[in-house]
UniProtKB/Swiss-Prot annotation:
The cathelin-like domain (CLD), which is the propeptide part, does not seem to exhibit auto-inhibitory function, as it does not inhibit the antibacterial activity of antibacterial peptide LL-37. The gene is CAMP. Residues 150-162 are annotated as: Active core. Proteolytically cleaved by proteinase PRTN3 into antibacterial peptide LL-37. Proteolytically cleaved by cathepsin CTSG and neutrophil elastase ELANE. After secretion onto the skin surface, the CAMP gene product is processed by a serine protease-dependent mechanism into multiple novel antimicrobial peptides distinct from and shorter than cathelicidin LL-37. These peptides show enhanced antimicrobial action, acquiring the ability to kill skin pathogens such as S.aureus, E.coli and C.albicans. These peptides have lost the ability to stimulate CXCL8/IL8 release from keratinocytes. The peptides act synergistically, killing bacteria at lower concentrations when present together, and maintain activity at increased salt condition. This is Cathelicidin antimicrobial peptide. GO terms for cellular component: extracellular space; vesicle. Disulfide bonds join C86-C97, C108-C125. It comes from the Eukaryota. It comes from Chlorocebus aethiops (Green monkey). It is found in: Secreted; Vesicle. Antimicrobial protein that is an integral component of the innate immune system. Binds to bacterial lipopolysaccharides (LPS). Acts via neutrophil N-formyl peptide receptors to enhance the release of CXCL2. Postsecretory processing generates multiple cathelicidin antimicrobial peptides with various lengths which act as a topical antimicrobial defense in sweat on skin. The unprocessed precursor form, cathelicidin antimicrobial peptide, inhibits the growth of Gram-negative E.coli and E.aerogenes with efficiencies comparable to that of the mature peptide LL-37 (in vitro).
Length: 170
């Protein structure tokens, strides 16, 4: 008659299960992407779906919003990409490509998940018109400063000419 000592002991199975329990959470944690890694993956997807001739590369990443800890919950993202000199057909990573001088700049918004296994994103990109808005703001400031300066100069000339008029003694 066999006893428990002849087969695998309960202690060994407990040890194996304990080790598996310790290893599994590490494997799950390793699959969670950082905010920036998730955005870079989304840019890879944008480049694959794009009909433009060249790859796009991250130009500016807006600050990470406060988020919950669930990697499966879609996280809001917003960033700017710029056209590079590398053609879409290249095997290079966009990060290895230089930005194209006067390349197209796109503003992208949407959501990404940080769970590497799900690897989902919903991003839309439009031509970035913010730089033109900033240019308009710059010209308004210049106009205001020049206008104010001209008024001061005009007032000083008026005062100077007013002092040149001979005064009559009464």
């Amino acid at each position: 008659m066999k006893t428990q000592r002849d087969g695998p002991s309960l202690g060994r199975w407990s040890l194996v299960l304990l080790l598996l329990g310790l290893v599994m959470p590490l494997a799950i944690v390793a699959q969670v992407l950082s905010y920036q890694e998730a955005v870079l993956r989304a840019i890879e997807g944008i480049n694959q779906r794009s009909s433009d001739a060249n790859l796009y590369r991250l130009l500016d990443l807006d600050p990470r919003p406060t988020m919950d800890g669930d990697p499966d919950t879609p996280k809001p993202v917003s960033f700017t990409v710029k056209e590079t000199v590398c053609p879409r057909t290249t095997q290079k990573s966009p990060e290895d490509c230089d930005f194209k001088e006067d390349g197209l700049v796109k503003r992208c918004v949407g959501t990404v998940t940080l769970n590497q296994a799900r690897d989902s994103f919903d991003i839309s990109c439009d031509k970035d018109n913010r730089r033109f808005a900033r240019l308009g703001k710059f010209f308004r400031k210049v106009k205001k400063k020049i206008g104010g300066g001209l008024k001061k100069i005009g007032q000083k000339i008026k005062d100077f000419l007013g002092n040149l008029v001979p005064r009559t003694a009464s």
